Amino acid sequence: MKSLLLAVSSGLAVCVATALAQSDTATAKKDETKIPASSAEEVAVIKTAKGEMIVEFWTDVAPKTVENFKKLAKEKFYDGTCFHRIVKGFMIQGGDPLTKDPAAQARYGTGDPGYKIKAEFNDRSHTRGVISMARSQDPNSAGSQFFICHGNPSFLDRQYTAFGKLVKGDDVLEKIATTPTHPPDRPNKRMGVTSIKIVPANSMHLP
């Protein structure tokens, strides 16, 4: 299996992160899923062990990525998964269906929905709270795994598909991103995703 290595430097220290890596599996289908036309304005409500985060979507720059995420969420694909990779000051990564099984930790980070989607790299910068698609070395290898930026990793711009941003729940992001971890960037305590629901934006009390 192949994985992507990212070098993240801070001052004189350099740490090599595989945080955005998503391994290719032999059984994964490489055909692209058919995405339905974008629906009315909606947001995602990510219910976690630490509280709720609400994501607004950038359908103007990543329409197929947004619709794929919505499709999976509506199918309850993400329910019962967890944030399996956490790098404080960088990002939290989730969306792997294999994380539904606590006994499969050795394979965390390799799961997908059985298909890949094409990249929609765009000019939106990776700043705190931005949600983007994880992938392997192949630019068109994203499937279901995503990450939410804890820091401002602008070096990822135009290399990963940013498709939305938190509009509520920054405190929840902070709690998850600062939880104690052990190699390889696994949280000591499971950071579960109870559900991801897609709801009309006008049904939420947003700032």
Label for each model-derived stretch:
Residues 2-9, 15-207:
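Cyclophilin-like peptidyl-prolyl cis-trans isomerases
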